[in-house]
Amino acid sequence: MASTTFSSAFSILSLPSSSPSPPPSPPRTLPVANRRRRAAAVASTATESPKVLELGDAIAGLTLEEARNLVDHLQERLCVSAASFPPAAAGLRAAAVEEAPVEQTEFDVVIEEVPSSARIATIKIVRALTNLALKEAKDLIEGLPKKLKEAVSKDEAEEAKKQLEGVGAKVSIA
């Protein structure tokens, strides 16, 4: 089958197309530096069969219209279509999303509830943690739940929670 596909593909390359088309444009040439890189790449494929190298050279010499015609012919011949192949970039993006779980680095300390017996002790702790004046600390405690600290490190949030729970307040870290 490989030889049949090879001979069919090669015969298409050598036959002119039946549809009228504009005259083929002259083939583009590579600058000397690019030719050297290409020559090095071709030299590394010297272990491949001569058929493969000959076919590769023939395909590389095609114009864009001839290449499009070759692709159409091979899709018909092999019963495949470009739509049957999923885009490669979509799979890479999905993998990248799964690999990088976002780790939270900033936390908010929220005072949920303060029993009436622990209000004075809680106000003292709030003043020590935030450097608020007495009136602002009292106002903070009255309209709960409220954020005591925003965007702090995990250690600082845990320490504040520990101190506030020590005097009887209910605290959460978000």
From Swiss-Prot:
<feature type="compositionally biased region" description="Low complexity">
    <location>
        <begin position="7"/>
        <end position="18"/>
    </location>
</feature>
<comment type="similarity">
    <text>Belongs to the bacterial ribosomal protein bL12 family.</text>
</comment>
<feature type="transit peptide" description="Chloroplast">
    <location>
        <begin position="1"/>
        <end position="45"/>
    </location>
</feature>
<dbReference type="GO" id="GO:0006412">
    <property type="term" value="P:translation"/>
</dbReference>
<feature type="compositionally biased region" description="Pro residues">
    <location>
        <begin position="19"/>
        <end position="29"/>
    </location>
</feature>
<keyword id="KW-0809">Transit peptide</keyword>
<dbReference type="InterPro" id="IPR008932">
    <property type="entry name" value="Ribosomal_bL12_oligo"/>
</dbReference>
<keyword id="KW-0689">Ribosomal protein</keyword>
<feature type="region of interest" description="Disordered">
    <location>
        <begin position="1"/>
        <end position="46"/>
    </location>
</feature>
<keyword id="KW-0934">Plastid</keyword>
<keyword id="KW-0687">Ribonucleoprotein</keyword>
<dbReference type="GO" id="GO:0009507">
    <property type="term" value="C:chloroplast"/>
</dbReference>
<dbReference type="Pfam" id="PF00542">
    <property type="entry name" value="Ribosomal_L12"/>
</dbReference>
<dbReference type="InterPro" id="IPR014719">
    <property type="entry name" value="Ribosomal_bL12_C/ClpS-like"/>
</dbReference>
<dbReference type="Pfam" id="PF16320">
    <property type="entry name" value="Ribosomal_L12_N"/>
</dbReference>
<keyword id="KW-0150">Chloroplast</keyword>
<dbReference type="GO" id="GO:0003729">
    <property type="term" value="F:mRNA binding"/>
</dbReference>
<dbReference type="InterPro" id="IPR036235">
    <property type="entry name" value="Ribosomal_bL12_oligo_N_sf"/>
</dbReference>
<protein>
    <recommendedName>
        <fullName>Large ribosomal subunit protein bL12cz</fullName>
    </recommendedName>
</protein>
<dbReference type="GO" id="GO:1990904">
    <property type="term" value="C:ribonucleoprotein complex"/>
</dbReference>
<dbReference type="GO" id="GO:0005840">
    <property type="term" value="C:ribosome"/>
</dbReference>
<dbReference type="InterPro" id="IPR000206">
    <property type="entry name" value="Ribosomal_bL12"/>
</dbReference>
<dbReference type="GO" id="GO:0003735">
    <property type="term" value="F:structural constituent of ribosome"/>
</dbReference>
<dbReference type="InterPro" id="IPR013823">
    <property type="entry name" value="Ribosomal_bL12_C"/>
</dbReference>
